[in-house]
Amino acid sequence: MQQETQFDLIVVGGGTAGAFSAIAAAREGLKVAVVERGTCLGGLAASSGLTEMNAAGFQGAPLYRGIEREVFDRLIWGGHAAYHFAVPMSSNKEVKIDRLRYDPERLKLLLEQLAVEAGITLLYETELTAAREGEEE
């Protein structure tokens, strides 16, 4: 038996952009679901071994705002991330960028915690295969 559920917003893809968007929308009072084909939120940033966000700051000041800033600050306060400013790029040592280095496992856990706290329905190992407009069956 299929259960019908209504959502104000369905976010397809639970990468960092999708997760941040879903959390922001849910905090504004929308009923939100995230459809994610993988097994966690955060996408490549949480599951690929990637441990840095480039362009995290400019001249020593963090650039992220909103949900992103909250997530990264919480990782830093917990000892699971740190800003590194003016890091030479591997492809051109003369170009320096600011980076946030973090623990991807902690990012996964934090995104899930924030989503659950916001009341988001998480649909892991699920893919969107069709969509329709309107309320017709």
List each language-model region with its residue ranges.
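Small-residue (primarily alanine) positions within well-ordered alpha-helices
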Residues: 17, 21-26
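A short alpha-helix capping/helix-coil boundary motif
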Residues: 1-2, 8, 89-92
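Beta1/beta-strand and adjacent pyrophosphate-binding region of the FAD-binding site
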Residues: 3-17, 33
